[in-house]
Amino acid sequence: MQYKDLRDFIGHLEDIGQLKRISHPIDPHYEMTEISDRTLRAGGPALLFENPIGYDIPVLTNLFGTPERVAIGMGRKDVLELREVGKLLAYLKEPEPPKGFKDALDKLPVFKQVLNMPTKNIRKAACQQIVWQGDDVDLDKVPVMSCWADDVAPLLTWGLTITKGPHKKRQNLGIYRQQKLSKNKVIMRWLAHRGGALDLRDWMETHPGEPFPVSVAFGADPATILGAVTPVPDTLSEYAFAGLLRGSRTEITKSISNDLEVPASAEIVLEGYIDPTEFADEGPYGDHTGYYNEVEKHHVFTVTHITMRKEPIYHSTYTGRPPDEPAVLGVALNEVFVPILQKQFPEIIDFYLPPEGCSYRMAVVTMKKQYPGHAKRVMMGVWSFLRQFMYTKFVLVCDEEVNARDWSQVTAAMSQHMDPARDSLMIENTPIDSLDFASPVVGLGSKMGLDITKKWEVELALSPNVECSLTSSEQIEGCIAEITKMCPEIIEIHLQNDNANMVVVSINKQAAGNAKKIMDAIWAQFEENKFVIVCDDDVNVSDWNDIIWAVTTRMDPARDTLFLQSVGETSKMGLDATNKWEGECLREWGTPIKKDPEVVAKIDSIWDELGIFK
């Protein structure tokens, strides 16, 4: 189904019960986040807050709060159909000429889709029905959300930032958060490798000291929004890809104050410039990791014009501990990634980015193994093939019969097929997300690959598997009692898959180095143990959503992994997934996001009136 603009999409979602209008007055500061978070975690509808307290502009949240709504926004009936989108992207990334007449006929549908790629220029665009400029520019009139109690300022989140490098033929669309500073200034937070940052860098080289034009569009049609977060080939513009998704050309219009082309149907557009010499401290903000990030300097975006539709809608979201809307988007886009990877690596059966791993910090791959060392090639491929995976800290590679999305199967394969030291690959000093406070320094850290496949004979030649006697169920209870006696800080011990091969422990951490003490105690009791994961008391050791979140947010693999090797014995691996204390890390550690009890109580008191699930 085609959606010509955001309002068309909202209307369809409302018709199928996937959008709820909230007429009750709600404060954009904290209250909308609490309501949106509860709704998303329950798999609920998109929300349109019609009466934000203190503002005349409605606020739309949770638009892509379920994978199904992402699929609908891409014009697909269900999530599985997103693999067809991935196949199209894989084809466009590396097109193959027809092998003959019949093959050409088979490819006709693709060629017809490509015809929808050119954009269509609109002179009198809806997004410019109202224009604020000069002293009329006032972001205080826009209901920009404040999400968490310790956020430094309101945060603009869903804007499509449009830039163009001086040497590029096409524009770049990216989504970068923007801290509101004043009526006409925000901080543009983009990572160094992202398109907008690269465009600015090129501009500063060719136009030193000159202002860099930027436009930011809020509330575009769903295909354009999703085109900005999808891994489109470098040769394809996001607008062109949106045309492919929609089945019709993307309508654009020139900004009033610069030459950048913006979505013609956008609800609100900010136009202005970045002064290459103007910076400001950004943050802290509660982000998608579940923590507040560090304060960093970023460029300031000065807004010279605000254009909008009549009676505009402000599209917003929040980020927090998974699941949040970015995590849900990650689940849906995961299906797009699979065919792209399979075209390059046909041996890949499935590819999974667990949302609890912040949607990109861990990848589980299943493959049809074809030669010794094959798993390591796949690890390297994941890290190097797509920019989206350059920050993936952990890559787990399993055989094809393992369900990559079932932790009981993945962990069983780890226990059965791995010698931890032999089958682990560690790479240090690699690019890491600057928001990852667990890395030793900003932007640089380590990555770990785990080869969970069955080993071939040649792979065992230098390091054969060692058989260990299993602790009986009768003995396990006594061993656990001894461990807890030695380590009173232990809160709970979980034996994954009902044996001691893999043990997950939660502790009330008392000092730096506590995790190693726990590992040593477990290894002293369980000869067969291969893996110990030590977590803090806020982790449910029976819940792999909790465990993976702790592992991916609180570990630098090289620093926080301990190997124990003895001649004639299977090696052992200990993962310290606790929050690090002074002396255990160099950087300021992240502070977990905590909800404001007063806000929670306020929403509790009006929850039934909202009728979100009625």
Swiss-Prot record:
Source organism superkingdom: Bacteria
Record GO biological process: ubiquinone biosynthetic process
Key words, A-Z: Cell membrane, Decarboxylase, Lyase, Membrane, Ubiquinone biosynthesis
Keyword tRNA processing in annotation: no
Compartments where located: Cell membrane
EC number: 4.1.1.-
SS bond list: none
Region described as Unknown insert: 460-584
Cofactor: a divalent metal cation
Broad EC category: lyase
The protein's annotated pathway: Cofactor biosynthesis; ubiquinone biosynthesis
InterPro entries with a match to the protein in the record: UbiD, UbiD-like_C, UbiD-like_N, UbiD_Rift_dom
Recorded topology in the membrane: Peripheral membrane protein
Molecular function terms from GO: 3-octaprenyl-4-hydroxybenzoate carboxy-lyase activity
Function: Catalyzes the decarboxylation of 3-octaprenyl-4-hydroxy benzoate to 2-octaprenylphenol.
PANTHER family according to UniProt: 3-OCTAPRENYL-4-HYDROXYBENZOATE CARBOXY-LYASE-RELATED, FERULIC ACID DECARBOXYLASE 1
Description of how the protein assembles with itself and partners: Homohexamer.
Protein name as catalogued: 3-octaprenyl-4-hydroxybenzoate carboxy-lyase
Protein's organism: Aliivibrio fischeri (strain ATCC 700601 / ES114)
